[in-house]
C-alpha cells in the first residue's frame, strides 16, 4: 500500500496528505529523498512536516506551522539537521534554524490601519543556509540573503492626518567571525509623514521627519534626525501645452 498524495491549493478542500516527493543530488550532501506531509489541524491552522534523508546518514526535519486569526497571522519554520559532518572539521554535529513572521492588526480607533509586525531569522551555523539551500523553505520566511540575517519589530500607523512607522531592526553578518562585530542594531528608528496644507498658494505642504540610532561594530553608535518641509506646486499647463510644476525642500539634519 502506498499513501495517496494530495496537493493542497485554494481550489480544493483542505485535507491532510503527502505532497509531491523530491529527489536531489548535491556535491556536498550527496543524494537525498524528501517526502513532505501536509497536516490540517483546524480550519485556520495547518502544518507541513518535511523530512529529508541523505545517503550520508544525515537527516533534516523541517516543520512549517501556519495560523490565521481574525486580526493576526503567524507562520513559523523550524529545521533540525542531525548527523551532519562538516568538510572542514570532519566531525558530526547537529545544526538548526528558526524563521518566524507574525502580523497583528491592532485595530486602533480613529486609524485607517494600525499594524504590528515581528520577524525572526536564526541559524546555529554560519554556512548552514548555503549548504542546505535546496532544502530551505520556499515560503515568505526564506531569508533573502544567506550572508545576512534580519530581525525586526515594527509598528505601522495610518491616520487620515499622518503616517507613522517605528520599531527596531537587527542584522547579523554571517561572514564576520568576531561575535560582537557581526551585529548591527537600529534601535529605535521612526518615520513620520504629515500633510500640513493641501491648498497653499496653489500647492501642497508636507512635513517628514525620520531618525534612528545605529549601533555597529560593537561600540560604533551613530544617531541622526532629519526633518524635511516640502512644498509641491500643482501642475499647470503652458500656452504651448507643456505641463509644469516645481517644489521646494527645506531640510534640517542633526547627527551625532
Question: What are these language model-derived features?
Answer:
Residues 1-256:
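Outer-membrane beta-barrel proteins and related beta-barrel translocases across Gram-negative bacteria
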